[in-house]
Amino acid sequence: MKFILHIIALALPLWGVGGSLHAQSLKDLFLKMPQEVCPVLSEYNRLEIVDNQKNDKTMQTRNLFRTFSEMKELTDDYAHLVISKNSEKEFKMLTKNDGTRIIMVISTILCDDIPDSSVAFYSTEWKPLRTLDYYTLPPIDNFRKVTIDKATSQLTVTTTNAPLKLSIEGSNQPKEPFTLTNTFRWSTEESRFILND
């Protein structure tokens, strides 16, 4: 009887019972990520990236657009995915004041070599969270590049007020863009990013 109880106790984590007792790594969550978060990567593509890392290969896969996407870095709490030459995503695990972990996803596209980023937050079950609960955007609504320091969780937002380069005859010279940089730090106590002074 003791032997049977011992076998059941060992098998419970495999069945998902007690699985919440250990924190999931970003690698695990990347594999479970819904395709809506990164539509060009199928479940197979994500599995191939993680398998390539385990086998010390380039973490690259042919995505659904039949071009290559490459994971530049994948750790237990940070990931940097280059989707195409004009698109990338960064993932960072953050801890709130109650110990709950959330995932921040920074999506960046290049528009005429000017980066434009958006930030989204998710639970570890990949349920979308309200961004304004964790981060307030700078007041300028033009192009922004958002980066995160994977070690300190410091968020840097560079906003560029760049003019459009559209003109009928090509005679309008674009003026130099105005650039503003704001730096935020993650506050576990407040469970949100706070603008550095």
Describe these PLM feature segments.
Residues E90-D98, R144-A151:
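Structural signature of eukaryotic scaffold interfaces centered on beta-propeller domains
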Residues E70-H80, F121-D133, W186, E190:
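Surface-exposed loop/turn elements that mediate protein-protein interactions on large endomembrane-trafficking
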Residues A23-K96:
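Terminal domain-start segments
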Residues L81-V82, T108-P115, I168-E176:
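Short consensus segments that form the blades of beta-propeller domains
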Residues R130-D197:
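Short aromatic loop motif centered on NTY/YTY
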Residues D98-D133:
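Mid-length scaffold segments of soluble, non-membrane domains
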Residues N86-E90, M104-I106, I114-V119, I140-F143, ...:
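Short, surface-exposed coil-to-beta transition loops
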Residues M1-D28:
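Bacterial Sec-dependent N-terminal signal peptides
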